Amino acid sequence: MKIGNREFDVKNRTYIMGILNVTPDSFSDGGKWNTMDHALMHAEAMIKDGADILDVGGESTRPGHTPVSAEEEAARVVPVIEALRKRFDVPISVDTYKGSVADAAVQAGADLVNDVWGLKYDAGMADVIAESQTACCLMHNREKAKYVNFLPEVLMDLQESVDIARKAGIAKDKIILDPGVGFGKTYEQNLEAINHVDVLQELGLPILLGTSH
């Protein structure tokens, strides 16, 4: 699949996404990179360490996080994305579930929208992605970790996200799926999702696996 100007051979190799949180309260690195100099320094270090794509986040999604407005989130990520675009030749992802933030990020140079609610939070998100023709990562998420049949329900939920994307006009070769480790799942369910990535591949799309540690 193509993300930005780079081809990703997702069928034959694994790629690394470097996470750049420009937030004061993210799970692992809150407050470390929320100045421009520190953000660019960390981005350069991740690229040297082998990151194939950089994911910029302006709002923590950890349990108990403090929500921020779309305006504040955009103000955090847009300048960083613009600076990354000028300085590095690497695809850039924006981690947001808000359509207006995604739109601003794409205009600033983002190549991929990473939505932790799989297009189910903001009704306008799918249209933003479709119109910009960027790639997207659709993550599985639920407000509560309540399941009758865990894996089949995860597959069903992800298929719903894919259906929303396709209905909006997002091409299938622009879609990545994420089982959402740490989101709406118990510890045991997180491990089950990780151990059964092969089941998720039944949907015929690339899989992104994001774990905090």
Predicted features and spans:
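Glycine-rich, proline-tolerant flexible connector loops at the mouths of alpha/beta enzymes
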Residues: 26-28, 52-79, 181-187
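N-terminal amphipathic alpha-helix/helix-capping segment at the start of soluble metabolic enzymes
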Residues: 1-24, 169-170
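Conserved, mostly hydrophobic/aromatic
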Residues: 20, 46, 50, 95, ...
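Alpha-helix-loop-beta-strand connector modules within alpha/beta enzyme cores
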Residues: 66-94, 99, 103, 129-137, ...
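Active-site mouth loops of central-metabolism enzymes
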Residues: 22-41, 66, 93, 144-152
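Short, well-ordered coil/turn segments that N-cap beta-strands
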Residues: 11-16, 51-52, 86-90, 109-111, ...
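Catalytic beta/alpha-barrel core
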Residues: 88-97, 111-122, 154
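Conserved anion-binding
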Residues: 24-26, 61-64, 102, 108, ...
